[in-house]
Swiss-Prot record:
Residues 174-239 form the HTH luxR-type domain. Keywords: DNA-binding, Quorum sensing, Repressor, Transcription, Transcription regulation. The gene is rpaR. This is HTH-type quorum sensing-dependent transcriptional regulator RpaR. The lineage of its organism: Bacteria, Pseudomonadati, Pseudomonadota, Alphaproteobacteria, Hyphomicrobiales. It holds the Pfam family GerE. Responds to the quorum-sensing autoinducer 4-coumaroyl-homoserine lactone to regulate expression of several genes. Represses expression of rpaI in the absence of the inducer. Residues 198-217 bind DNA. SUPFAM superfamilies: C-terminal effector domain of the bipartite response regulators, Pheromone-binding domain of LuxR-like quorum-sensing transcription factors. One of its GO terms (biological process) is regulation of DNA-templated transcription. PROSITE patterns: HTH_LUXR_2 (PS50043). It comes from Rhodopseudomonas palustris (strain ATCC BAA-98 / CGA009).
Length: 243
């Protein structure tokens, strides 16, 4: 049986979605790039929409733009006049780049951005806006002649949403659970914060110095601290111990 184009794109997208939660960032990005490339998209970017308070570099989650284009885009502050992210901020619907509204005569700066993009092989593109409680973002992909059929666009939307969500989750700092340290570890860190040596703590608590050192090492490991001093500092910051 010959698989139709719609079914093919649907299958590829679902296979990607099924694998997302098992992938770490490098493997996820590699699979995402491979999938969009099969659709004719040779470049992409996943980023928050720039604002007065934050520029594109610090908002970028994954950058697949040509290096020279990204550098030019940032140095020329193209995000301030680019019709694609401008339109993305006002809609929840994915759209083709050429459908982003602007007037060539009244908005020559916007036209210049699109013209310069084409010089880097980014002739036509597809943008998927995403709006979260903490801000807006977009996945924008482009190429010289990408497949923009409804089936391909639907697949690109689906994989982009899942890829962005997974990368956002992976980029968040892993929270330290307040209850990870045992009462004994907290007690020993409390004494360490007061400047007591391992031997002095062992005398105070009537345990061996070796046991004290073991608990200090375990506490540092759980707090992702490089040494005893860093562990004490982090425990104080988290409110696990007090001076």
């Amino acid at each position: 049986m010959i698989v139709g184009e719609d079914q093919l794109w649907g299958r590829r997208a679902l296979e990607f979605v099924d694998s997302v939660e098992r992938l770490e960032a490098p493997a996820l990005i590699s699979r995402f790039e491979s999938l969009i490339a099969s659709c004719g998209f040779t470049a992409y970017i996943m980023a928050g929409l720039p604002s007065r308070n934050a520029g594109l570099p610090e908002l970028t989650l994954a950058n697949g733009w040509p290096r020279d284009w990204f550098d030019l885009y940032v140095s020329e502050n193209f995000s301030a006049v680019d019709p694609v992210p401008r339109h993305g901020a006002t809609t929840v619907h994915p759209f083709v780049w050429s459908d982003a509204p602007y007037d060539r005569d009244r908005d020559p700066a916007a036209h210049r951005v699109m013209t310069r993009a084409a010089e880097f092989g980014l002739v036509e593109g597809y943008c998927i806006p995403l709006h979260y409680d903490d801000g807006s973002a977009a996945i924008s992909m482009a190429g010289k002649d990408p497949d923009l059929s409804p089936a391909a666009r639907g697949a690109m939307q689906l994989v982009s949403i899942y890829a962005h969500s997974r990368l956002r989750a992976l980029s968040r700092p892993k929270p330290i659970r307040r209850n990870r340290l045992t009462p004994r570890e907290c007690e020993i860190l409390q004494w360490a914060a007061q400047g007591k040596t391992a031997w002095e703590i062992s005398v105070i608590l009537c345990i061996t110095e070796r046991t004290v050192k073991f608990h200090l090492i375990e506490a540092a490991r759980k707090l992702d601290a490089a040494n005893r001093t860093a562990a004490v500092a982090k425990a104080l910051t988290l409110g696990l111990i007090r001076l």
